[in-house]
Amino acid sequence: MGAELCKRICCEFGTTPGEPLKDALGRQVSLRSYDNIPPTSSSDEGEDDDDGEDDDNEERQQKLRLCGSGCGGNDSSSGSHREATHDGSKKNAVRSTFREDKAPKPSKQSKKKKKPSKHHHHQQSSIMQETDDLDEEDTSIYLSPPPVPPVQVVAKRLPRPDTPRTPRQKKISQRPPTPGTKKPAASLPF
């Protein structure tokens, strides 16, 4: 069962067992082991910001514990694999430094640094939304041009310019049509 969970975790990171785990930016993720640290130990400091992340964190850590040494992404610098046990006598929790992991909550000092950035992000996103709205108004002008009436092409025959004709051409044009060129309609065969 441990190997199956290991495969699931490796699939979550987008790698196969035996390959190092990498985050979304392509950096190698090191899985570290730590002993006897409850998953909610650092979350006691900041309970006012609890969004149910502890439940997700515990589930993820449980999966990582069951994975044990079957993962190929364990800390590659040490070369040794630690095994997780299910009996509770010795539990090695494997925690990832991957950004999407629900790691234990940071200390109060780092929260103070993050709060202004969240507020700034909110201001920035609202400003971006306003500029997007303005952009939509501006681009709507350009995206829908006024309808153009269809152009009707009228073929007008321009009069032929007067060209100097030779006396022979003038004579030919003044002659009446010859009877051989005109055929009567009654003589047509069916």
Swiss-Prot record:
Q: Where is the composition biased (Acidic residues)?
A: 44-58, 130-139
Q: What is its main location?
A: virion
Q: How is it modified after translation?
A: Myristoylation and palmitoylation (probably on one or more of the nearby cysteines at the N-terminus) enable membrane-binding and Golgi apparatus-specific targeting and are essential for efficient packaging.
Q: Where in the cell is it found?
A: Virion tegument; Virion membrane; Host cell membrane; Host Golgi apparatus membrane
Return the InterPro entries for the record: HSV_CEP3_betahv (IPR034705)
List where Basic residues composition bias occurs. Answer: 108-123
Where is composition skewed (Polar residues) in this entry? 30-43
Question: What is the name of this protein?
Answer: Cytoplasmic envelopment protein 3
- UniProt source species: Human cytomegalovirus (strain AD169) (HHV-5)
Native organism taxonomy: Viruses, Duplodnaviria, Heunggongvirae, Peploviricota, Herviviricetes
